[in-house]
Curated annotation (Swiss-Prot):
Gene3D superfamilies: 1.20.1280.180, Chloramphenicol acetyltransferase-like domain, Choline/Carnitine o-acyltransferase, Choline/Carnitine o-acyltransferase, domain 2. Pathway: Lipid metabolism; fatty acid beta-oxidation. It is a peripheral membrane protein. This is Carnitine O-palmitoyltransferase 2, mitochondrial. It comes from Danio rerio.
Amino acid sequence: MMAGLLSTQCNSTLSKLKHLSNNPALSVLTSTHRKYSSKDGAGSEYLHKSIVPSMHYQKSLPRLPVPKLEDTIRRYLAAQRPLLNDEQYSNTEKLAQEFQSGAGKQLHEELVALDKKNKHTSYISAPWFDMYLSARESIVLNFNPFMSFNPDPKPEYNDQLVRATNMVCSAVRFMKTLRAGLLEPEVFHLNPAKSDTDSFKKLIRWVPPSISWFGAYMVNAYPLDMSQYFRLFNSTRIPKYKRDELLTDDRGRHLLVMKRGNLYVFDALDRDGNLIKPAEVQAHLKYILEDPTQASAFPLGVLTSENRDTWTGLRQKLLDAGNGEALQLVDTALFCLCLDEEVLRDHIHISHNMLHGDGCNRWYDKSFSVILAKDGQAAINFEHSWGDGVAVLRFQNEVFKDTTEKPLVGPGSQPASVDSSSAVRRLEFKLNDELKAGITKAKENFQAAVSKLTIDAMEFKKGGKEQLKKKKLSPDAIAQLAFQMGFLRQYGQTVATYESCSTAAFKHGRTETIRPASIHTKQCAKAFVQQPGQHSVEQLLGLLNECSKYHGQLTREAAMGQGFDRHLFAMRYLANSKGMALPSLYQDPAYAAINHNILSTSTLTSPAVSLGGFAPVVPDGFGVGYGVHDEWIGCNVSSYPARDVHEFLRCVHKSLEDIFTVLDGNPIH
């Protein structure tokens, strides 16, 4: 009866999801909009005990739609329009129309048929894994991003040993909570007063998992895909020729710790799978911090920063030299904790250290690493193939909340009187001359790559989310518009721009692309940058409004799986896998250009995260991490020598000043 009622009320996936579109923060779907209200007091083993089982909604999540081909072509051409002159656009339009009625029609039909056969997943999941795992470039800078933790509000708890101990304990508690099915499901609440309540949870837990999603939907709550979570722990990317593999072995009870490029392991769980005493974790970490062993002349971790095929060959040589057991301990460890000896001076120093560091005190292949500097500055650096940061951000939020609200050790805590010298093992590796030469070469390659990277940050203090919302403008749209204006001011052109948007509202959803550069942003940027004084305040406000409305539409479409990028990507992947001649749309220089993302952007706001960052995705690009806060807007931007990041940020700041001047009703000159 209930199933029938629910399914008749929720017959169309896309209409079910339309309410999601009202939220401006959809590009990250972060946990900041949800409070976890399940019962605490879960003892030292669990963070909390959710009333609703963690994976209760997973089975009934809606499937990621394959967009209609005509919609994809229309959206593709709309995104190409501001990037091309009339002649180029006319050619691209012709190729797109040929594709729609010819090769594209066939590929689309095959993709839809394939998708119907694989109802347990999404059409993008396998090709997306394949894309990441087949990439041969170094994962450092090219793929791994970082998100840094805010400091503990209690300064004395930022001591490196105290914070490391608390983070390890909270991380293990998170893992245990997740594996016991007691972690609160990831749900996006549009009406928390109705859906984020114990009474609703007690009701929904009895709705069968096959239809539970619909029950949540009826109270405007949207469960999100949690299929990536199982790769958080005991997981590593293993280098292989042509295509890497992901290894997850949840039998591992040990933690991997790195200091001065040396690798240590100790069991963080006892034989019964319980967290060892926090005082014992503290004792073992203290022992590692005080270990006088000097920095390794041949730090093995730097090999994980190499070209993937090069690393594959060297890994085989490591195995041949008798290092199999030590490598297995690295690969199956719960996660990696990197204890750095540097004190970090400022945001820029933090970004460089957490994004890449010196290459020696990292194992970049681990699913994630918690990095802790000498002064207690902390961050997560994560390998990107297994997930999109949705699981990592949830983990980071929970760990920050747990370590700051319920720390298990403090500045006055005494480490346990245990024999850490027998509990902690420093891994020894047998290295022949060939391996030593490989490590030396990897160090050189690493230094050459990171020495080209510049990072700069900017804080705009004259306004933020609150003021923009009062003016009925999308905060994300205005931030993206400022990047378009900034680039136009600096370089005089409009270029391919990428904004990541989560499709976690669907089963095995990954991301879709929002294309922030539009005919609207181009017109508005020209008015502000190249024609100041030629437009009235009312006209400029009208242009801002148009940009905001259109960006909101693009965001809604992307979050509902209605972009064009993933659909075109999947059809291209299908053509390649069949050995088909590549359709002419994909050979169009304009297709290459729109996928050469000079502005690669991603937004993040969370109470746990102070800043996030990543390198540009192309040599002549910018990597733009940003957050629109209540009263201010922050950007953390990277570039290579082809671009001037300092000047770019000055231009973005000037753009924001102009926008807020107009919002105050004043003209710009």
